[in-house]
Amino acid sequence: MMMTTLSTIRGFWDPVLWMAAFIIVIVITCYIRSLGKEEYKRGTEQTMVFFSGNIPPKELISSSNIYWGFFKAMEKYYTCIRRFHTGMVNDYVYYFIVIVIVIIASLIIGGVLWM
Amino acid sequence: MDVKAFNRSLWVFHVNTGSCNGCDIEIIAALTPRYDVERFGIKLVGTPRHADVLLVTGPVTREMAKKLKRIYDQVPDPKAVMVVGNCGSTGGVFYESYNLVGPVDKIIPVDVYVPGCPPRPEAIIQGVIKLWEKLEDKRRGKC
């Protein structure tokens, strides 16, 4: 398949130009990286995580930890919502059908009332 | 002063090992528009792994000794250490306190001392210049 420029009203899309830009960015990134410090000694404290001078904990603290207060404040809501998330496709299809019925019903009823 | 070998900014990591914050405020004063050391490329960084210089204030409390050693180890070579204030240099008014294991040079090697309680920003800037020269020498392998 031949790669061509796709012109639209708003602009154009050219995969070759896009690839060229991508390669240029990679080259610049590699150059900047090559300017970095080379003095780090592997296997020493110099390559360890800085944890305010403390030994870093072995267990990782996940990023979801920052939402602790959020989850705690909305605990009742999440407890309720989690019951629906059974992981079973049958349940999700059932929810889908119910919602579609509700939408169709409201459209029909709304349409009839409008008429 | 010849600083050609060190041809980039001097990045500093600041550690408070029990200071009363007097010296720390003077360090901040050196960064404010009146002195503005950042125009020379001297700036504070958030991790010792990015730093060329370790700047220590305060006599070293028992709790901070191991942490200070670890932070010093995390600074990449060549590195230099600067102590700002009497407490870090000699122990100051806390000398021989039961809760201290300092001064700083008992824990890690120190290159430059800036005495004062607290030292003025001019003194801190002069200390940084001395330190810069030492780093130059270290980079060239003179010491």
Regions found by a protein language model. Give the residues of each.
Chain B
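Iron-sulfur-associated redox domains of electron-transfer enzymes in respiratory
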Residues: 1-143
